[in-house]
Amino acid sequence: MTFLNDWFEWNGERSTAHGVYVLEQPPVTMPQERSKQTSVPGKPGSLTTLKGEDVYDDLTLTATCFIRDPARIPEITAWLKGGGTVSFANRPCGFYHARVSNQIPFEKILRGNPHCSFAVNFRCSPPFWYVSNPEEVTITTSSYVLVNPGSVYSEPIIHVYGTGDMTLIVNGSFVELEGIEDSIVLNSVIQEAYQGEMLLNEKMDGEFPLLKPGNNLISWTGDISRLVIAPNWRYLA
């Protein structure tokens, strides 16, 4: 017998395709802010110093699983390794970037029964990425307000269509673009500017744009015909 929440996906492959079924899903977990606690002589409590804005420690999310056929263990161990993306049946709307972070012991459930149970620990890097993101948002007029529905800043990929020298302004932060021919991509995820396979970092001056939760004012000067944005909305939990 199987249940609706008996799976997870690792690098796009569902666990049930490998004969792995989930007995217990990891709970939805809020990550912890990365901070330093300092005791202050003569005062109660401690002083908290944040180590950056919107910086959070990794989460360890554990899926407790079982398999019916131990002969598939070599196949499973070849699949469950390294890094990639993980999503869970109790939260199929998105994914984490993660690594498998534990040795996986396969233990027999009952003597004489071939079923084996095991736990997989995924060390997840917050935030949680929504898969229901709009693929693209097209903006054709300056002074446009783009609303980030997430709970943490996003790292967008912005395709700027235009020619010559221009300035992109996101929430008051300026990105100067010089000598552009037709278009340029500003990829805030990988911190690179390019067109196709050609790097164009030398044509950009300024910080790669981020989109904060809530309203984001986007405007420009110069010959920009449109922006096409992959927003990459994200959530803390």
Kindly label every feature range from the protein language model.
Residues 39-69, 114-128, 216:
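Oligomerization/assembly interface segments of phage tail-like spikes and tubes
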Residues 55-57, 80, 112-116, 150-152, ...:
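Solvent-exposed loop and beta-edge segments used for protein-protein assembly and interaction
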Residues 74-81, 112-114, 135-137:
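"Short basic amphipathic alpha-helical interaction patches in structured regions
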Residues 29-31, 87-130:
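Short beta-strand and beta-hairpin "edge-sheet" elements
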Residues 130-237:
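Intrinsically disordered, low-complexity segments enriched in serine, threonine, and glycine
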Residues 1-39:
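Polar/acidic, low-complexity leader/linker segments enriched in S/T/G and N/D
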Residues 4-7, 64-103:
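Short, acidic/charged, Gly/Pro-enriched secondary-structure junctions
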